[in-house]
């Protein structure tokens, strides 16, 4: 998630919660982003995607994730917003569940935002649904989103740092939280998601626009690996112990198979959005030029829906 320019230069454990989320209200979907797909992956069969909007989500199909929802719709998916708590009947009949920045309370500024967004029975329902063959895309940004989503991610063995992650050696511009992933810096791992179906879909450059770090289970693939220079930083007021720690060996993109299903967990949400921020309408997300975030979104969905093996 993109932070304000002031915040991006203040990565420190003492960063106040108010500063950490400054500028969120100015983030809006880019109305000029081109979501057309020249050759849709699905033209007859249309996998059903449930996009969550029932858990105080910062990103929704009609809001900041509209470009993502429109893009995958144009690729042949049937996207349906979710307005209910997760249960077996809620998930029945869907192929992919997408959850983007669910929160424990409305608004990133809320002191309760880092509380779990999901009840225990909801987490069990999602776990059982994936085990039976469903696919989950769980996206949880920097604080407070990590705390709100870790109860669910742990059902699949994925730990969340629950703070902010920066890399002084691999970043875009002057924001050390905007981490850059390329084959040259060896932070993009080989996986069906990064290979795509052919050379035209291979991922060569990703930017994550300030998120958190993840640690997947042994059988997972960290397709967006963090460098040894990456650090996790947690300011006060985020619902977890403030401090600074190495993020070496962790990731911002993890893929795994779980029972008959598949799971992708991302530690940053803006990279699959297309947003503009501030009076200068600064672009961040899939609408940034020179990056493969748009193709990454499609490849992730292709893997989750079984098009990529």
Model features per residue range: what roles?
Residues 12-22:
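Bacterial N-terminal signal peptides
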Residues 2-14:
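Bacterial N-terminal signal peptides that target proteins for export
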Residues 24-309:
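Short, surface-exposed patches at the edges or C-terminal ends of soluble domains, predominantly
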